[in-house]
């Protein structure tokens, strides 16, 4: 089993979750988070859910408040090893714009999964 952690733009979460559900992966956890890559933050007029990266890069300081960390969403999904390429591919297809801020995907080993309600373990407990 693997845990796939994807940090994506907030405006692409619905498209991403809909696409994952459509290929058989409706079970996931989402968290609001803030982060940055090498760009070291951006300027924005206020604290929106979605930052227009092209406008930020063009206008810079003229936009107002400096955002050291950009609003993002973390999607976490545990899948069987064989499903990793499919899930990663779906996430990449929806979230790759080719611009700074597209996000990151981490694939981590998961030793065990236990469904609390039933006590089921392993792949059965994943629920996909």
Tell me what each language-model feature is.
Residues 1-128:
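Positively charged, small/polar-rich N-terminal and surface patches that mediate targeting and assembly
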